[in-house]
Amino acid sequence: ILRIFHTELEAVYEEKNRSLDSDGSKVFEALFSELFKNHNYGQQTTIGTVEHLKNPSLVEIRKYFNNYYVPNNMGVILSGDFDPDMVIAQVDKAFSYMKNKPVAKYTFKPETPISAPVVKQITGPDAENLTMGFRLPGNKDKDVLIADLVRQVLTNGKAGLMDLNLVKKQKLLRASAETFTLIDY
């Protein structure tokens, strides 16, 4: 697998470069870095840092693979028109070499409450926009359902408060409210 690593790394590097040129990606990264100072959500993007990509450690990559790419830490999702018995047999055969092993639970220092507004400015070629973020509880918390209901009242593409009062009255080109909840926050 590692023999094709460098060609894959080039593709990942190109994806990282695209994100560095994207105002939206820069805004999202800045938002998460401010909301999650302790959690990995705000420490780096999924694709990693430029430094990680410049100096990859094959030893660390192999270690990560061996620790986390285990059957009890993954799922196989299939869709389409196929014979389930045949496909399950193929999946079983393809992954039969893998053995279950304990996977350490992710731990992190809880975030401190946000006590004052945080303002970050991102510069780039895109049109000006405002992004506001709020740290919510994890996706298993019932308050997240309330946050999603508020989102739908604000914007739903047709008759949300922001849709009617800002977009349809042409006060703004676009306005949206989104809930982006993850496991821990």
Predicted regions and their residues:
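Short beta-strands and strand-coil junctions in structured, solvent-facing domains, enriched
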Residues: 1-2, 84-85, 137-141
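Short, glycine/charge-rich beta-strand/loop segments that flank catalytic centers
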Residues: 3-14
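Non-catalytic beta-strand/loop surface segments
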Residues: 18-72, 97-141, 152-185
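Carbohydrate-associated surface elements
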Residues: 81
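Short amphipathic alpha-helices in soluble, non-transmembrane regions
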Residues: 89-94
